[in-house]
Amino acid sequence: MSTPTPLSYKDAGVDIDAGNALVSNIKAAVKRTRRPEVMGNLGGFGALCEIPTKYKQPVLVSGTDGVGTKLRLAIDYKKHDTVGIDLVAMCVNDLIVQGAEPLFFLDYYATGKLDVETATSVVNGIGEGCFQSGCALIGGETAEMPGMYEGEDYDLAGFCVGVVEKADIIDGSKVAAGDALIALASSGPHSNGYSLVRKVLEVSQADPQQDLNGKPLIEHLLEPTKIYVKSLLKLIEASDVHAMAHITGGGFWENIPRVLPDNCKAVIQGDSWQWPAVFSWLMENGNIAQYEMYRTFNCGVGMIVALPADKVDAALALLAAEGEQAWLIGAIAHREGNEEQVEIL
């Protein structure tokens, strides 16, 4: 009887050495995001982080999210360096809505076969997103799972924790009729609606490399999600922000009501901004109804802020100084009975 060939984990499709190489590659990206509250170094069983001492009654705010099927486009077109920014943005933009300063972030990267170069590019993007939001990348998990994913496909998930002073939590309870609504421009579709985006590409048989307003269509579609944290933290400090809505899945119709009292509705002037070209292209080439566009995509509006009408000019000036494109998009009105909570005129 012949002696069986000894098996290793690598024979089963899991390369521990590749995982170690990835950890080595990302150390600089992680170090760049370090905050003074972080304790210990990368590689521990658990990641430690103190709460900043400036908070008297700190409340922790947590969020988790992914990038959705935008990853399919990124994988197909081998554009891996920005989806990590998307991952962070989807989490930290949700935290800032409640007034929370992001503290730390952890990522989960799952794949069938670990490609160190691809994974390094992705995690470096996560580090860039954390840097943009002032958030420490303190840990994560890389799971190589042969048989679970096709080829070198991968999926991402992120988890973020932030902190806000208990007295300063923004929960929409101060929103009242007469408040103004300010919009902050998006960078593109961000990370929502990509199953519909891909369907439009399929049905229209469009060339993703075709020119749209001076750059390839695929670059518009893979533009990373804008991170609003630093500019909105300054606005919160300087103004009286009553509510914020991150325009993600569900678009205008579902996200704005999440931060409104039952007796209030948002009245939005649909002609107060021009849709970026990518949304007009999607609408035309997919024959998508306007209602569906507002339900699926941000249509050029990544964040909406509600605040007193007399604070608008100062808020717009501050946001402009922070590099944000922002404009007055509408107002809060009294809601009667079962009226819809969002009207776009």
Curated annotation (Swiss-Prot):
Its EC number is 6.3.3.1. Keywords: ATP-binding, Cytoplasm, Ligase, Nucleotide-binding, Purine biosynthesis. GO terms for molecular function: ATP binding; phosphoribosylamine-glycine ligase activity; phosphoribosylformylglycinamidine cyclo-ligase activity. One of its GO terms (cellular component) is cytosol. CDD domains: PurM (cd02196). The keyword Ligase applies. It is found in: Cytoplasm. One of its GO terms (biological process) is adenine biosynthetic process. Pathway: Purine metabolism; IMP biosynthesis via de novo pathway; 5-amino-1-(5-phospho-D-ribosyl)imidazole from N(2)-formyl-N(1)-(5-phospho-D-ribosyl)glycinamide: step 2/2. It holds the Pfam family AIRS. It catalyses: 2-formamido-N(1)-(5-O-phospho-beta-D-ribosyl)acetamidine + ATP = 5-amino-1-(5-phospho-beta-D-ribosyl)imidazole + ADP + phosphate + H(+). Belongs to the AIR synthase family. This is Phosphoribosylformylglycinamidine cyclo-ligase. It comes from Shewanella putrefaciens (strain CN-32 / ATCC BAA-453).
